[in-house]
């Protein structure tokens, strides 16, 4: 374990908890899903997110939460209580904030499951997400899958849109823009032959991860028919921080794809930006139709 990871329990209790966890979670490793969740001062949103995972109809799961140096007493209280109450939950505490990619990697290191899934601490899953998506992956024999998701405005407390995933997502498509919602993604370590970790970028680390996986498995299949997750948004409009993503996009092109500075800038300006704008336009149209259907 990295020296920055501090488990805030006495060593004796921690050893007991780990042994008890192994004994109590009688799961087939071939079916086990390790759910990766980073959190940082998530407060009141955290409890709903955790509940949406632990209440899944799919029984074989473990939830690995890495607290990325939270200072919020509400967040820490929720984590301590849920870890003591449910043996499927394992919490790693970091002594200061490192970023979501680093936090996810600490959980991935601890993961025991064949499948690795992701959910952030303010997002939610539908109750049957894992049951449906794992069955879909087995049917398709695919190593990477995702799904569509609903966009929920926390300020207004209502669904305001939908992001519809393409049926198939290739490496070539992903070079233009991230088309996989991290909160819906699952990858199969057995088919891929290993675990994959996120680059420790402050942003766009999920896109970088999926590019790495698609280099090997070639295609990601999207679950059809219905959304399987809820992305919780706290603002109506796109954050101004989106502008700062330019440097992280270029960093992904350079570090993951090995492009030089000029080629990375070219891809960003002439491939990413046009694709990103078209994606936003499509999402707006899909969301309008979704909200209108809901009445």
State where each predicted segment sits.
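Short loop->beta transition adjacent to catalytic acidic/histidine clusters or analogous donor-positioning motifs
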Residues: 31-33, 54-65, 86-90
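Glycine-rich, basic loop-to-helix element that forms the pyrophosphate-binding segment
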Residues: 94-111
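Short, well-formed alpha-helical segments that are part of the catalytic scaffolds
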Residues: 42-55
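A conserved acidic beta->alpha catalytic loop
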Residues: 67-77, 96, 120
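Conserved nucleotide-sugar donor-binding catalytic segment
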Residues: 109, 164-248
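The conserved acidic donor/metal-binding loop of glycosyltransferases
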Residues: 120-124, 148
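Conserved donor NDP-sugar-binding/catalytic core segment of glycosyltransferases
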Residues: 128-159
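Short aromatic/hydrophobic "clamp" motif used to bind/position activated sugar donors
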Residues: 116
């Amino acid at each position: 374990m990295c020296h920055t990871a501090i488990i805030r329990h006495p060593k004796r209790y921690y050893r007991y908890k780990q042994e008890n966890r192994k004994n109590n979670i009688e799961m087939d490793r071939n079916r086990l899903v390790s759910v990766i969740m980073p959190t940082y001062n998530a407060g009141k949103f955290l409890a709903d997110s955790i509940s949406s995972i632990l209440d899944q109809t799919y029984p074989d799961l473990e939830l690995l939460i890495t607290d990325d140096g939270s200072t919020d007493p509400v967040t820490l209280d929720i984590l301590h209580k849920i870890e003591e109450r449910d043996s499927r939950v394992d919490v790693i505490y970091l002594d200061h904030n490192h970023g979501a990619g680093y936090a996810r990697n600490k959980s991935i290191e601890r993961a025991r499951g064949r499948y690795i899934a992701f959910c952030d601490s303010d997002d939610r899953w539908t109750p049957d997400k894992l049951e449906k998506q794992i069955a879909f992956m087995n049917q398709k024999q695919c190593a990477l899958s995702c799904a569509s998701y609903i966009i929920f405005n926390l300020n207004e407390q209502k669904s305001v849109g939908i992001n519809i995933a393409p049926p198939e997502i290739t490496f070539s498509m992903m070079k233009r823009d991230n088309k996989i919602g991290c909160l819906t993604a699952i990858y199969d370590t057995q088919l891929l032959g290993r675990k994959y970790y996120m680059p420790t970028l402050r942003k766009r680390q999920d896109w970088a991860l999926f590019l790495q996986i698609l280099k090997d498995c070639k295609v990601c299949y999207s679950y059809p028919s219905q959304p399987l997750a809820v992305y919780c948004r706290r603002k109506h409009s796109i954050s101004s921080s989106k502008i700062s993503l330019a440097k992280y996009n270029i960093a992904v092109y350079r570090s993951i794809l090995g492009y030089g500075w000029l080629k990375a800038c070219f891809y960003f300006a002439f491939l990413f930006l046009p694709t990103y704008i078209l994606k936003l336009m499509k999402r707006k149209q899909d969301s309008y139709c979704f909200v209108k259907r809901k009445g």
